[in-house]
């Protein structure tokens, strides 16, 4: 390609590698095989009780090591696995990418399990005040990193050797 911009002078983007995780599986091959075979990734929701909900099925990814460890851990595992697959497919190493990192991530929040853990760390007060009292205890320090907006992108940037400040976009 002799020209690196399109007719409106925008940079041309070429996809050279792809990484995929869906409720059907991990990797482009597993997903393509499942889709081609007509399999569905829709199944009963198991992450939380659905007794009083109208929707009880979903296409959740609940088979990864981090699937029950909260949204930040799951987001990191999915991003790391898909980036590794995409870089391998593109023929690039995964330790010195050399380019910028742009990450689309879900909102950063504590899982309900984590909130209940923080609440149980204290016996002082009630409600939100008790949760906050638990959150400042030394044994709660691990929750801090997982709830920082850019922490997942920072870890990915370190893992893949990207350049510049990583950028995270969230809904």
Give the location of each predicted region:
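Conserved "HGTGT" condensation-loop signature of ketosynthase/thiolase-family condensing enzymes
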Residues: 1-166
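Short beta->alpha junction loops
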Residues: 168-171
């Amino acid at each position: 390609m002799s020209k690196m911009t399109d007719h409106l002078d925008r940079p041309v983007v070429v996809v050279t590698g792809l990484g995929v995780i869906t409720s059907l599986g991990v990797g482009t091959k597993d997903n393509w095989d499942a889709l081609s075979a007509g399999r569905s990734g829709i199944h009963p929701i198991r992450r939380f009780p659905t007794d009083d909900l109208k929707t009880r099925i979903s296409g959740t990814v609940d088979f990864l090591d981090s699937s029950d460890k909260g949204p930040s851990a799951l987001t990191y595992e999915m991003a790391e696995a898909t980036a590794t697959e995409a870089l391998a497919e593109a023929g690039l190493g995964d330790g010195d990418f050399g380019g910028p990192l742009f990450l689309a991530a879900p909102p950063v929040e504590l899982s309900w399990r984590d909130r209940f853990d923080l609440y149980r760390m204290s016996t002082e007060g009630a409600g939100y005040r008790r949760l906050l009292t638990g959150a400042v205890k030394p044994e709660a320090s691990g929750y801090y990193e997982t709830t920082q907006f850019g922490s997942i992108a920072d870890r990915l940037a370190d893992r893949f050797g990207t350049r510049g400040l990583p950028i995270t976009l969230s809904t």
